Amino acid sequence: VSHSITRHDPTPLMIGDTTVAPGSRARLQIDLVELADGTKVRLPVVAINGIRPGPRLYLGAAIHGDEVNGVAILSEALAPLDPRSLAGSIVCVPVQHPLAFYADHRIPISQFMKSPLDQAPIDAWTCFPGDPRGNLAQIVAATLFGLIRRCSCAIDIHTPTRGGRYVPIAILPSPSLGAAAEAADWLASQAAPGYIMKTNIGMYVSPGILCVEATKANVPAFTFEIGEGGQLERAMIDEGARCVRNALIGLGMIADERRLPATSYIMREFLGIRAQRGGLLHTLTVLGHEVRRGDPLARIVDIYGDTVETVLAPEPGVFVRATTLSTVSTGERVATLGLL
């Protein structure tokens, strides 16, 4: 399967108006949009061009502006790389949506509040392959996709929004996408996060999602969720950097031994579990642990200290996403299981 990931000969790499020669690294910016006062918003790109044939890997983070773990993961993973010993090349966009990043919010909230109807759709992550003459989200998606479609494969790094924490989990495009989806599966296995979701239902495999549209365009890609929104978490940054470097090793781009997790789970479906009552949320299960049907996941306590609900696992699975908010109302998610 690895051989279905395209290899490129070492040639000058054109990013925007900049040429990155083999054996060199560059930090550059691509014009994105212009604000009302004339301020130019630019997309940051790190290009590392090796001197030997190999894949061209796209790495992206922070398409949602509060997903800062991914920004740190990429800088940590790429800092030690020497382009003079790299096979292939890397196109890295550490902040895929600068306006959302400025807002420190999942979406560019000031633009959305100014004109909610004109800004719909607002989530660039769902707008691929994008439209260069569309709204803000569609322009961001089109600009990113212009980089992605020139690459051999892609990894898109996320966290939940504030109030959620994921285990390090690779979420694959639907197996129904054929050989490119198989190659994405192989790439995720090389990254070895310890948790892999292989499903054909739900948000992550919907049309318009970055990794879905990349895979449809024959650029095998997966979504990598890790850690908590709005936080820089040292342990998660280290873990994410390990997975990115594992992928580089598996692709033959750098020479080293992959570092593997103690256990690995391959799951078939997400199951979100929501509160039936409101109150203070006490999570009872350790993130990443396997649970049985009927195991207590969380306790909801009212403002007087009385337990009003004990949330039980409705199915056996793995506790892959925790809610870190201290209060919940009826209908809010308190846990997500990955079903085995």
Model-found features: residue ranges?
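Structured catalytic-domain cores with a bias toward divalent-metal coordination
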Residues: 1-340
